[in-house]
Amino acid sequence: MGGEVSNKTWVFKQSPSGLPEPGVHTAFEDRPLSLVAPPGGLVINLLTAGLDPHQRDRMRGAGNVDYVPGYEVNEPITNFSIAKVIRSDNAAFEEGSLIAGSLPIAEYGIIPKELIDARAMASPLVWKVSNDYNLDVKHYVGTLGLAGMTAWNSFYGLVKPVKGETIWVNAASSSVGEVVVQLAKIEGMKVIASVSSDDKLDYVVNELGADVGFNYRKEPVGKALKRLAPDGLDVVFENVGGDHFQAAIENMKWFGRIISCGTASQYNKPVEEQYGVTNLSEIFRRRIKIQGFIFWDDNIYTDNIENFKATMPKWVSEGKIKSRYTQFEGIEQADKAFLSMFTGGSHGKTVLKISDP
């Protein structure tokens, strides 16, 4: 069964120097699509797209070689999403099944066999979702998707939690941060959480269970950490960068560890305007271990992903792991949804609902 459908698509147009401007750096285009599956491939209907701050980093352009490819001009913007298979020429993916992975943010998409077979280090780029607990599909782009895998693999693979240790999680109400806070409490750690508003502070302390927290817009980061962790920090789960990273270094215990997940405060700044950390010599003085990562890295993915798949859906269904979502409706809201992550307009995981399951 063939035919062609109109297909509104979110397209990357040019690299911004600051916040991307809708209609200049991104655009919506109708890119009609054939409903015939390619050999060994799929046709999908996108259900919910996840949006993440690191996408701004990918807007540097395709000519920049980095941990993930930059977006190509005049090509669809991609990110971790969940979709329904509507045409299949691949026995592993029957029509009507759900798939998740790195998908184009468009109403419909073609998934070639090459993408199905591809891997990013230890992880496939596309995989089948079973949804055994009949959860809202948005969880599979958040707590059970990229955010959850990022938090789980790095927490158990790099943080290596020790009961009684003190961990500071910044951007603690973000999609990754909120999971790390809860995993740390499950493992008996003392959690200090920092956020950008009083509403988020209430959430991370009174709903997620952080021991203490602070609003960095009201209290300088370094001052707050000295107040809340006078004996220093064992672990920092770093999502923000900039002054937060500097404060992390100056408040670490000897042999402490900083796990660097991202630098969200710096993504929209030109290189010459990015924060200059001035206390790097404290790294050797305090014997600090700093480790960056991507969730699919061989050293953390292979040993942890099966436990994630077996445990997290159950915990989400039981309410043991909580999460918040800021959901936007319709592909036309993609720019607004994306910008909300940098302007304080989102809470938890930002998702874009495009179609019903």
From Swiss-Prot:
It comes from the Eukaryota. Pathway: Mycotoxin biosynthesis. Residues 1-22 are annotated as: Disordered. Its EC number is 1.-.-.-. Residues 1-17 have a biased composition (Polar residues). Keywords: Oxidoreductase. Pfam families: ADH_N_2 (PF16884), ADH_zinc_N (PF00107). InterPro entries: ADH-like_C, ADH_N_2, GroES-like_sf, MDR_fam, NAD(P)-bd_dom_sf, PKS_ER. Fusaric acid is phytotoxic to plants such as cotton and banana. It has been shown to induce programmed cell death in plants. In addition to a mild toxicity to animals, fusaric acid exhibits acanthamoebicidal, antioomycete, and antimycobacterial activities. Disruption phenotype: Impairs the production of fusaric acid. One of its GO terms (molecular function) is oxidoreductase activity, acting on the CH-CH group of donors, NAD or NADP as acceptor. Dehydrogenase; part of the gene cluster that mediates the biosynthesis of fusaric acid, a mycotoxin with low to moderate toxicity to animals and humans, but with high phytotoxic properties. L-aspartate is suggested as fusaric acid amino acid precursor that is activated and further processed to O-acetyl-L-homoserine by cluster enzymes aspartate kinase FUB3 and homoserine O-acetyltransferase FUB5, as well as enzymes of the primary metabolism. Belongs to the zinc-containing alcohol dehydrogenase family. Quinone oxidoreductase subfamily. This is Dehydrogenase FUB6. It comes from Fusarium oxysporum f. sp. lycopersici (strain 4287 / CBS 123668 / FGSC 9935 / NRRL 34936) (Fusarium vascular wilt of tomato).
